[in-house]
Structure formats: C-alpha cells, structure tokens
Amino acid sequence: MMNRTTPDQELAPASEPVWERPWSVEEIRRSSQSWSLAADAGLLQFLQEFSQQTISRTHEIKKQVDGLIRETKATDCRLHNVFNDFLMLSNTQFIENRVYDEEVEEPVLKAEAEKTEQEKTREQKEVDLIPKVQEAVNYGLQVLDSAFEQLDIKAGNSDSEEDDANGRVELILEPKDLYIDRPLPYLIGSKLFMEQEDVGLGELSSEEGSVGSDRGSIVDTEEEKEEEESDEDFAHHSDNEQNRHTTQMSDEEEDDDGCDLFADSEKEEEDIEDIEENTRPKRSRPTSFADELAARIKGDAVGRVDEEPTTLPSGEAKPRKTLKEKKERRTPSDDEEDNLFAPPKLTDEDFSPFGSGGGLFSGGKGLFDDEDEESDLFTEAPQDRQAGASVKEESSSSKPGKKIPAGAVSVFLGDTDVFGAASVPSMKEPQKPEQPTPRKSPYGPPPTGLFDDDDGDDDDDFFSAPHSKPSKTGKVQSTADIFGDEEGDLFKEKAVASPEATVSQTDENKARAEKKVTLSSSKNLKPSSETKTQKGLFSDEEDSEDLFSSQSASKLKGASLLPGKLPTLVSLFDDEDEEDNLFGGTAAKKQTLCLQAQREEKAKASELSKKKASALLFSSDEEDQWNIPASQTHLASDSRSKGEPRDSGTLQSQEAKAVKKTSLFEEDEEDDLFAIAKDSQKKTQRVSLLFEDDVDSGGSLFGSPPTSVPPATKKKETVSEAPPLLFSDEEEKEAQLGVKSVDKKVESAKESLKFGRTDVAESEKEGLLTRSAQETVKHSDLFSSSSPWDKGTKPRTKTVLSLFDEEEDKMEDQNIIQAPQKEVGKGRDPDAHPKSTGVFQDEELLFSHKLQKDNDPDVDLFAGTKKTKLLEPSVGSLFGDDEDDDLFSSAKSQPLVQEKKRVVKKDHSVDSFKNQKHPESIQGSKEKGIWKPETPQDSSGLAPFKTKEPSTRIGKIQANLAINPAALLPTAASQISEVKPVLPELAFPSSEHRRSHGLESVPVLPGSGEAGVSFDLPAQADTLHSANKSRVKMRGKRRPQTRAARRLAAQESSETEDMSVPRGPIAQWADGAISPNGHRPQLRAASGEDSTEEALAAAAAPWEGGPVPGVDRSPFAKSLGHSRGEADLFDSGDIFSTGTGSQSVERTKPKAKIAENPANPPVGGKAKSPMFPALGEASSDDDLFQSAKPKPAKKTNPFPLLEDEDDLFTDQKVKKNETKSNSQQDVILTTQDIFEDDIFATEAIKPSQKTREKEKTLESNLFDDNIDIFADLTVKPKEKSKKKVEAKSIFDDDMDDIFSSGIQAKTTKPKSRSAQAAPEPRFEHKVSNIFDDPLNAFGGQ
C-alpha cells in the first residue's frame, strides 16, 4: 500500500508523461525498488512497443523470406525452362541426327548436282550427270539396301519383281532398325555426344554391311523366335485352355487338341519351312504334324492306358489326375510323356506347356480326355469293376486326389464329380453297378458321405479323395465299398460289385476294422476335414456334416463309450467311423461289428445282387421306386445313421447313437443292415426293413450293445421282419418294449433324478438307450429320434435349407413323433428326401444329377442332417418340440447335460414320444402302448404317404412342405387351431406354435401339427419356423434379440452355470415328463388341460391317441400344464427347457428336485408340486410345473429370484403378476436354462408363461410358446390381444418391460446368472418378474 500510495503521490504531477510513454529499460531498473502503478503502465507501454517492434521485424523477415521463396521459385522455373530447352534440343538434335544420316545429304547433293548440270551445257550436264547419277543411284541403292529392309518382293509382289527400282522404291521398303546391331546414339548432353560430331550415328556406314547381314540373321532368328513364341504361346494357350477344359471335363480339350492339331497342321507348314524351328518348338509341340499325330495317338494309347488305370478308377480321380497329369506333364510330364510321348519325344516340353494341357493330352488326352474322362467315367466303372484294377486305380486315383488339393481338385472333382461323379452318379444309375466300385475307390472318402451320402459321395468323393488319401485305397475302398455311394453305391457298388465288392467289402471291412483302429483317428480328422472340404461344395450339408462331424467328433468321444456298437460302424463305415472316432476308438468292436457288417454286407451283396437286377438302384426313379424300401430304408437308416452319429456324438444317445451310428454311420452297415434288412426288406417290407435296419442296426449295431438290447432287438427284428404291421405291431411291441424301457427309463430317469441327469443319461444311454435303441430300432424311433437329432443337427447344419429343412424337420420331427416307424420308413427316406430337396437346392446346383443324388445325397445329405433332427425330435419329443429342440439342439448339444437330457429324453422319446410316453408310461404304459400303436397306425398311414414322397422329387417337395395327411385331419386342424391363436397373432409364435405344437402335436401331429402350421399358417408357420429354427440352430449362444430374450439369455448363462447340475434337468425331465404325469395333467386341468387335452386329443385323433396323446401329451401337457406357467416353458422348455431350460433350471433346482423328484416322478404333479414349492424356491422348475397354476403363491419367491431380473421387471411385472412371474419365472428359468443358447428363449418363454397363464387352453399356444421360444415376442402380442386391457398395459409393460425390462434384464442378466448360480430362488423371482407382466397378462384374464 505504501508503494502504491507513494508512487501515486509522486506520479500525480508527472503521472501523465510517465504513464503515457513507454519506459526505458533504465527507468524500469531504477523503479524496480519502488514499483508503482505508473511503473506498471510504463512497463506495459514498453512491452507493447517491444512486441510491436518484434512483430514488425517478424513481418519484415517474413517478407524477405517470401521474396526468397519467390526468387527460388523463379529460379526453379528458369531451371525447368532450361531443362525443357535441353529436352527440345535433344529431341531436335536426335531427329536431325537421324535424318541427317547421309540420306538427307544425298538428296541435297543430287539437287546441287542437278543445278550444276542445268547450268552447264547439255553435254556437260550429261557427262557430269552420268557419273553423278550413277553415284547417286548407287548411293541411293546402298541407302535402300542399308537403311531399308527390302522385303522379299517375290513374297510381297510377284509383279513388282519386274520393276526392281520402282518396285523396291514403291513397294516393300521397310526401314531397318539401325540399332539392332549397333548402340543407340549418344545421349544428348553426354560427354561423347558433345565430343563426337556423329553423336554415335556416324559408324552406321562402316557397320551397315555387317548390320545388314546380321540383321538378316537376327531377323530370321527373331522371326524364328517369334514363331516359336507364337507356337509356345499357342501351346501355353492350349495348355491354359486345357486346364480350364480339364476342370470342365476337358470337353474343350478336344478343341485344344484341335487347336493343337490345327496349330500343328498350320505349324506343319511352318515346320516344312522351319523344321529346324519345330525341332526347337518340339519342346512345346511335336516335330511335325504327322509326328505329333503319331505321338498323340501313341501318347493317347499310352496315356489312356496309363491314365485310365490312374484316372479311370474314378471320374473324379481322372479329372484330378488329368489336372495333375497335365501339371505333371508340364513339369513331371517327362516320365508320363516319356512313356506317353516317348515315341514322339514330342513333347514333354511341347506338352509340358502343351502336353499336359494341350500337347499329348490336347491331341491325345485332350481329344480323348473327354473320351478318357467320359470313357473313364465309363471305363472307370469297368476297370473299377475289376476289383484289383479298381483298387490299384483307386490308389492311383486317390493318390492323384492327394496330389490335388482337396479344396482345389476336390472342387473340380466336385465339378468332375458333377460331371464325373455327378455324371458318374447319373451314369451310376445305369452304371452304378460299375461305378460304385470305382466310386468305392474314389469315394472311399465318402465317410463324409456319412452325412452327404451321395452329395457326400460327390463332395465327399471330392473331399474324400483327399480324405480317403490318408487312409488311402484300403480305407477308401472299404469305405467306398460300403460308401461308394454311401447310400447309392452301397447298393449299387454292392449290387455291381456285390461279388467283388462284397468280397472286397468284406475284406475291406476287415481292413477297415483294422484300419479304422488306426485310421479312425485319421478318419475322424478326415470327416471333419472332409466335411470342411465339403463345406465349400455344400455349405449347408457341410454345416450339418461339420456340425455332425465336429459334433460327431465330440459325440464320437461320447459315443466312444459305445465302442461295441461303434465297431459295427467302424467296420462298415470306416469314414463314418472316421467321422465318429467314437467308433474309431472301438476298433476291436469295430472289427467284430465289421464281421457283422461284413455278414450284413454279404447279405447286402446278395441284396445288392438282387438290386443289381435293378442296378439302376440309384437311378432316382428306380431307387425311389423299388429301392425306396431299401433305399429309403437305407436312407432312413442313413438318416438314423446320420442323425444317430450326431446322437451318439451327443452324449444323449451316444450308445444308442453309437449303436445307431453303427447303423447310421454304417450306412453300409445299415446297408448291411439293409442288406440283412434289405433281405428282410425284400422278405418283409420297408417297414420291416426300416425296422430291420433298426433291428440290424439294433442287432448288429446294437449287436455289441444288444447284450441288454438283443431281446428287444430280436423282438424288433421279429417285428421288423414281420409284415408291414411291423409298424403298428412293432410299435405296439415297441410301445410295450417302449413302456418297459420307458418304465426302465422312468426308473432310470428317477435314478437320474437320484443320480443326476448325467448319470441317468449315461445309464439310460447304456440301459435306456440300449432299450431305447432297441425301442428306437423297434420304433425306428431311435431313428426317428436319431432323425430328430439329425434334424436338430440339421437346423444347425442347414442354414440355407433351414427354412425348408427346419419345416421339414418339424414335420419330420412331428412325423417322426407321429410315426416313428413312418419316420423310419418314411421319415428317413422322405425326411431325407425332403431335406435333400433342401440340400439339393444346393446340391442340384452342384450336381445336375439331382434325382439320383436326391435319392442318395438327399438322404445322405439330409440323412445326416435330417436324421439329426429326427434324433432330436425324439429328444424333442421329451421337449415336445424336437424341431425347436433341434433348433436349440445345437444349444442342447452344447450342454452335455442337455444332451444327456436328450439322451434320457431320447430314450424316452426313442419311442417317438417315449419321452411323452415315458411320462405316460409313468402315467400308464398302456397309453404309451396305445399311443404308439396308434402312432404306428398313423405312421403306417403316414409312412406310405411319406414313403411315396421320397420316390419323387415332388414327394420330396411335399415332404419339404411337411404336409401331413394327419395334419390335414380335422383333429389336427383343431389342434392346430388351438395352437393357432398364438400363431396368427405371432409370427414367431407360428414357429413357436410349431414348437409348442410340436410339443403337443409332436406325438400327435408331428406332421399334422407342422402341416397345420404350414397350412393354417403356411407362410408364417413354416417360414417363420424355419427361419426361427435356422436362427435357433444358429442360436447356440446367440444373444436373444429382445431384451426379455436377452434377459433370459442372461439367466441362461447363469443357468449354464447351473448346468453343473445336470440332475435337475433329468429329474425335471423325469418329473416334467414323468412326475408331471399327475402334475402336468393337474396343471393342465388347472391351466386349461381341457383345451390342451382337447388339442391333444384333437391332435391325437390323427394318432388315434386322442386320449393317449392327451395323456401322451400330458407328459408335454404335464410339462405344458405345469409349463404353462412352468412346464410350457419346458414344453418349449421341455422341448428346450427339459432339454435345455428344464435342464438348466433343473440344474438350478436339480438338487431340490433330485431330492424330491425321485419320489415325485411317480407322484407326478403332486409330488412335483411339493417338489416345485421347494423347486420353485430352489428353481423355477417347480414353478414351471406347479407355479403356473399351483405356484401363483410363489410370487414372492419369484420376486426374490426376480430381484435380479426383478430389478428389470419387478416394479411393473412383479406388481402386475407375481403369479405369472412365478409360473413364468420357472418357465423363464427353464427357458433361460433351456435357452442358455436361446436367442428366442426369453421371447418364447415369456410368451409361453403368459400363454400358459393366460390360457392353459393355449397349451397348443404353449406349444406355440415352444414356438414362442422362437417367437417369444410374437406370443406376447397374442397374449396382449388375449388380455388386451390388462395385458396391453402389462404387455406394454411386458413388452415394454420385456423389452425395457428386457434391457434391464440385460443388465440383470449377470444378476440372473449370479442369481441362478448363487441365489436360484432369486432367479425364479427374476423370472417371475420378467414374466410377471406376461403372467399378469394371463392372470389378468
């Protein structure tokens, strides 16, 4: 303050001058001791001035720098101008120098001379002129000679020869390139350029003579080189073309050959002139046309002889070999060409560019390539018929296949197979007797054919050639023998090669048994690689194959538990065994089974010999017509085998599947089985054959397992051998056996409740699956289950086909459920064919031989695929919606416990709805027996329907349409109509309708329900179902689309944690399927069992199981009744929840359930209700069954459970419907568990619970809820429409909450997971709250 005051006072008088002027540095220093405001002002002025000066100086410097830049740019511009001047000068000088070459001077000299001459007297001019003219003319002539190249006037103009000077001047004077022989002129500006006047041009005259002569020689050599190059180019061109043609079946190779022939003929003229050059071109082409022809003829003969053994083994091998040989000829062609072309010599090099592509082979092989390939296609068959030759050729062909990348050559082999293999299949139809053996060799790899049988054969052949390469000929042969067309060749190869092939197959089977031990690992690798390779060709099929090969690989591990059963597969299907190393592991048993398979193959061979009568067995028509019994049966068994590999791949039916796989993967075994079965088929019917296959697969396949199975298997065999009544009788027996085995299953299920689903699954797998395998063999429901399983896999596999295939899968699942035997007889073939139709959307593109391949590959492609779904439907039968299950089967297959569930369920569902029947068997074995016989009747009715389908592509399309006569029945319509309420409102519910309908109507209207869906809601139901199914099968762990679904997915993840408790699912399944017998019906009665049972009865009417399906569904109805709040989720849940949701929910609850379920399963609903109170607390499982109706009181528990998700939905949903939340909670838990992989789980489950509580009568809606699993949201809209007043608000909340709280559910998903993992009751509350609004929506009504 003092300083301020003082300065102010001091500066007061002088403040203005001090403040206004900038201070000097000296003043600032002086005032530093007594700083004042004036000093601040002065300092500010000083700083401002300094800043301004600095800025001004900076600007000045900037201007200077800009000036420098401008100057620099100007200098640069001038420099560039100089450069340009030099460039212009260089151009000018160069031109001047060139023109200045004596030529310019000469005319000038001439002109001067002329002028001088003019000036002189005429005499003088003449005198002077003569020498000058002579000199000029001579010089000009010299210039013309030296500077110009006088094209041969003789060649150019014969007339101009007379006028030498004129002709030469006027005509063909071409300036010579002076710099051919001499260096270019010096660079302008170079030292030499500056130093020498001629700038490097003056030496021309001295060099002209040598230049001219050199030029002539050089030009000649150049012309020769050009000619050679053109020849070589032509050779390369023809080679390239031939490469393309070779890939294209070398149809155009003849053109190349023709080109080579003509080129050679044209070149022959040149050869006449330039034989010397042609000797050089010999490298690329024959010395002369005659030599080339001789060489080609000899080369063709030799090449054919050499190639046919190598390439003839398979049309594939030949294209491969053609490519490889061509490539090899190009480079390695020395050996082949030495042999092939050794006489002409022509042409290793000639054809190494030419030869491999065009040379020998263009002339010989190219020309004959078509013939060779085609003849190879045909001659392959004869040579392949020669077992030794085919084996040897096979080795060579597979070796070439090895040489050729599986991807690349296989692709072309795909093409060649399209042409060679595909056309070979077409040729196979007539020639398959011939070709099958060849195909054996090429298609040894068909192990992949397991799934793709014929597609696989082509694809697998493409890929199998590489794949079979590891196993090489032996494996390839054995697999090829069995799998030559795995389905087609099985019959045709066996038919054609039945003596040879049978012997070789028997030997090969033995070799396989041996090799499979060693090769099983490689083959397992192969199948995956094959399937992978096949992916390129058949993405869908390969997906299924990959799904199955990979799944089968894992399943094979599980199935390896079934080595005894697997050995049969091993012996019969090396590659399938390869595919299922499960079987590969059991090499010894494989050998034993191989013996069985060999016996079967021998029987097959006899059958095939019989079929040889119609060697066209695989001609689509014949195959479909008479081969349908065998072929379809084979397809069915293939479907089973394919589905079964997956089932066996899955732990669920690993043994049963392994046994099934034995038949399934032993498509040959099945063929062998079919051989036996075919014999029996011929003796009995397809039905018996189907069951023969089952019996055979059950006996042979189950032969090792049949220890427990044999009585039933024998019964099955007897039944299958019995008249077509086998279906009904067999199913009745199966019903009895199924009841027994179901009772056993129930016991084992109870045990599983006690021991946990895993143990039970395994024990059931071993015991029940053996039984169920027997039953399944009896029912072929094992195969229907395996087919469902394949279907389940198929959805996974079929992404493209999924819409149709899934619909087909649903139909097939339902049909399988409806008619396990129908599915055996029909489901396999029709299913295979319908799916193959789907496949052949791809395969038809791939292979023109759609019919044959539809017959074989259809079954094969979708035998595996379809059958997988079929297997899953049996699994799904428990789940009610196996198709949905199949959709979720990938998810299910992911959780082994779920798979085990499936196994148990499959065991139960092995009788197409033994799962349902299992509860029914608990409820009453009578119903099961009744229902199954009814199913057999329906199956008989439907089986003929579908049996017809496979015969024609139309039938296949119909199968794809999943039109069930039963579905068209009024009862089916009524059932569908019940389900419909959900369907029309909900696009997804339509798919869910199928699912739930599949649950309900899988037993009753597997086909009709699907047909009902497809007809009542044709577009939505089928398309949506398939689309949802496709998604679902992709669903694995796909994140649910809706918040609610995501919430459920979160719960699923926690339930996935809960999956550690597999017992719960088993217990729950047993309870859901068994104990719900009482309880689910109670729930159903409570929750609308009337409508559900009406729907069931209506749906059952087609099955003649009106009451039984009601009861039969009551397992589902039980699940549905309970699952309305609870079981319906399990219906969708049981389809998925039992498989997945129940599994995980019961995993959550398994402990409480397991404790209670062992006692409760017989008690059914009541025991389960008490269980579910505990379970409701422990998990949503109790609520799933009981809380739907009994458990509304458990709102509180759901709220605790929902606390996690309740946070999401609690405020709105819990308040609105705690009861709903309880039942839906359980359902959600179940569904969440079910939909651990669920995308649609939350959607489907939430609507399921809503639907359950809204209308227990909507059990069809519950089935729709199963569909809702796919179309959860769509179900919700229905529910909204149903209880629009409260439901809308609730659904606004529910939908909004489902979505908004679904978002919350997303946040609470972790909570749900932790809640499920740790506080399971909380999880139920979450579920309840999640579904609180849906439950309230139902409850509100």
Swiss-Prot record:
<feature type="compositionally biased region" description="Acidic residues">
    <location>
        <begin position="220"/>
        <end position="232"/>
    </location>
</feature>
<feature type="short sequence motif" description="LFa 15">
    <location>
        <begin position="1129"/>
        <end position="1136"/>
    </location>
</feature>
<dbReference type="GO" id="GO:0071203">
    <property type="term" value="C:WASH complex"/>
</dbReference>
<feature type="region of interest" description="Interaction with phospholipids">
    <location>
        <begin position="937"/>
        <end position="1341"/>
    </location>
</feature>
<feature type="region of interest" description="Disordered">
    <location>
        <begin position="881"/>
        <end position="951"/>
    </location>
</feature>
<keyword id="KW-0472">Membrane</keyword>
<feature type="short sequence motif" description="LFa 18">
    <location>
        <begin position="1234"/>
        <end position="1240"/>
    </location>
</feature>
<keyword id="KW-0653">Protein transport</keyword>
<keyword id="KW-0446">Lipid-binding</keyword>
<feature type="compositionally biased region" description="Gly residues">
    <location>
        <begin position="355"/>
        <end position="366"/>
    </location>
</feature>
<feature type="compositionally biased region" description="Basic and acidic residues">
    <location>
        <begin position="233"/>
        <end position="244"/>
    </location>
</feature>
<feature type="short sequence motif" description="LFa 17">
    <location>
        <begin position="1201"/>
        <end position="1209"/>
    </location>
</feature>
<feature type="short sequence motif" description="LFa 3">
    <location>
        <begin position="450"/>
        <end position="463"/>
    </location>
</feature>
<feature type="short sequence motif" description="LFa 10">
    <location>
        <begin position="726"/>
        <end position="738"/>
    </location>
</feature>
<feature type="compositionally biased region" description="Basic and acidic residues">
    <location>
        <begin position="917"/>
        <end position="931"/>
    </location>
</feature>
<feature type="short sequence motif" description="LFa 11">
    <location>
        <begin position="803"/>
        <end position="817"/>
    </location>
</feature>
<dbReference type="GO" id="GO:0015031">
    <property type="term" value="P:protein transport"/>
</dbReference>
<feature type="short sequence motif" description="LFa 12">
    <location>
        <begin position="839"/>
        <end position="847"/>
    </location>
</feature>
<dbReference type="GO" id="GO:1905394">
    <property type="term" value="F:retromer complex binding"/>
</dbReference>
<feature type="short sequence motif" description="LFa 14">
    <location>
        <begin position="878"/>
        <end position="888"/>
    </location>
</feature>
<comment type="subunit">
    <text>Component of the WASH core complex also described as WASH regulatory complex (SHRC) composed of WASH (WASHC1, WASH2P or WASH3P), WASHC2 (WASHC2A or WASHC2C), WASHC3, WASHC4 and WASHC5; in the complex interacts (via N-terminus) directly with WASHC1. The WASH core complex associates with the F-actin-capping protein dimer (formed by CAPZA1, CAPZA2 or CAPZA3 and CAPZB) in a transient or substoichiometric manner which was initially described as WASH complex. Interacts with VPS35; mediates the association with the retromer CSC complex. Interacts with FKBP15.</text>
</comment>
<feature type="modified residue" description="Phosphoserine">
    <location>
        <position position="539"/>
    </location>
</feature>
<feature type="compositionally biased region" description="Acidic residues">
    <location>
        <begin position="266"/>
        <end position="276"/>
    </location>
</feature>
<feature type="compositionally biased region" description="Basic and acidic residues">
    <location>
        <begin position="293"/>
        <end position="307"/>
    </location>
</feature>
<feature type="region of interest" description="Sufficient for interaction with CCDC93">
    <location>
        <begin position="356"/>
        <end position="600"/>
    </location>
</feature>
<feature type="short sequence motif" description="LFa 9">
    <location>
        <begin position="690"/>
        <end position="702"/>
    </location>
</feature>
<feature type="region of interest" description="Disordered">
    <location>
        <begin position="621"/>
        <end position="664"/>
    </location>
</feature>
<comment type="similarity">
    <text>Belongs to the FAM21 family.</text>
</comment>
<dbReference type="GO" id="GO:0034315">
    <property type="term" value="P:regulation of Arp2/3 complex-mediated actin nucleation"/>
</dbReference>
<feature type="compositionally biased region" description="Basic and acidic residues">
    <location>
        <begin position="823"/>
        <end position="834"/>
    </location>
</feature>
<feature type="short sequence motif" description="LFa 2">
    <location>
        <begin position="411"/>
        <end position="419"/>
    </location>
</feature>
<feature type="region of interest" description="Disordered">
    <location>
        <begin position="422"/>
        <end position="554"/>
    </location>
</feature>
<keyword id="KW-0597">Phosphoprotein</keyword>
<feature type="region of interest" description="Disordered">
    <location>
        <begin position="1302"/>
        <end position="1326"/>
    </location>
</feature>
<keyword id="KW-1003">Cell membrane</keyword>
<feature type="short sequence motif" description="LFa 21">
    <location>
        <begin position="1330"/>
        <end position="1338"/>
    </location>
</feature>
<feature type="region of interest" description="Disordered">
    <location>
        <begin position="751"/>
        <end position="838"/>
    </location>
</feature>
<feature type="region of interest" description="Disordered">
    <location>
        <begin position="696"/>
        <end position="739"/>
    </location>
</feature>
<dbReference type="GO" id="GO:0016197">
    <property type="term" value="P:endosomal transport"/>
</dbReference>
<protein>
    <recommendedName>
        <fullName>WASH complex subunit 2A</fullName>
    </recommendedName>
</protein>
<dbReference type="GO" id="GO:0005886">
    <property type="term" value="C:plasma membrane"/>
</dbReference>
<feature type="compositionally biased region" description="Polar residues">
    <location>
        <begin position="1135"/>
        <end position="1145"/>
    </location>
</feature>
